[in-house]
Amino acid sequence: TYNGDHMSMYGVNAGVPKTLVKYLVQWVAKNGVDEESKATLLDIVDTPISPELIPADENGDIKQKTEDLVGPYELHDFFLYYFLRFGFRPSKIYYLANIAFGGVYDEETIKKWLSTFFRRFFNQQFKRSCLPDGPKVGSISISPRGDWRMPSDASFAMWLKEIENL
């Protein structure tokens, strides 16, 4: 949701990949809180990520699970890391992903989500261009005031063409 992350004066988790957020919450639950808080945090970790503004279905179940639409976050974080940290082309990222996730995802699934990643990464740049200040936590950052410079109207066409030729 555009503007949801932009309303705050400081983006505390902007530099933390989604997969790392889950592990951080698990660590805090197991190492730093009382039993009641631990149960709450572990329940949050076990809940699929979804847009919180969409109401549950008639059975109280989550109607829209984000990973069903955009793909597994572990793949997206992998793609993001190798794209930003090393500047690898889609073909090299695809090759590495097939090695890293070979027993988990087949080649077509990796290709599908790699294509989705690049399309969304380029199409959503306008959201990153106006992020509030935030910390750089790891070795990569998508903050426009830090490591990442990209025009909001950049085209992803050459990236998708390379993926189509895999």
Where are the language model's segments positioned?
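ATP/NTP-dependent adenylation/nucleotidyl-transfer catalytic domains that generate, transfer
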Residues: 1-166
